[in-house]
Regions:
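Intrinsically disordered, low-complexity regulatory regions
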Residues: 1-122
Length: 122
């Protein structure tokens, strides 16, 4: 098996384990609640994680003795893989708790011909 496939399997396992904490059955919180701006909220998470990763990598590049305190480079990269999978799932309308009457940016979808025409600028 290719190593990249193994990495994806590891990411799926991490996602499954973390989801038990973030969307546990004893809470009313659903995954979609974390993304009030839809895919834009997920992109903000990706951006934040990427900036943190750049910061750590630059520190490691400039100081051979530097090591991250809490999260390894591999952990951060796996988080990015999982966040990307959330973005794809959200764009498909398949995130737990996602409102089917809202689009991938969490905007209300037009429901009438007039609303559709107004949305298209006609």
């Amino acid at each position: 098996m290719r190593e990249s496939i193994k990495v994806l399997q590891e990411c799926a396992e991490i996602q499954d384990k973390k989801s038990r904490d973030y969307q546990n059955e004893n809470s009313r919180i659903r995954q979609a609640d974390y993304y009030p701006r839809g895919i834009m909220s997920i992109m903000e998470l990706i951006n934040t994680k990427t900036i943190r990763l750049w910061s750590v990598l630059e520190a490691m590049e400039n100081d051979p003795n530097y090591a991250p305190n809490f999260e390894s480079i591999e952990d951060s990269l796996k988080d990015l893989i999982n966040y990307s999978s959330f973005a794809v799932a959200y764009s498909r309308g398949k995130i737990d708790g996602q409102d089917p009457d809202r689009d991938f940016l969490n905007r209300k979808k037009p429901s009438t011909v007039k609303e559709i025409r107004d949305a298209e600028g006609q």
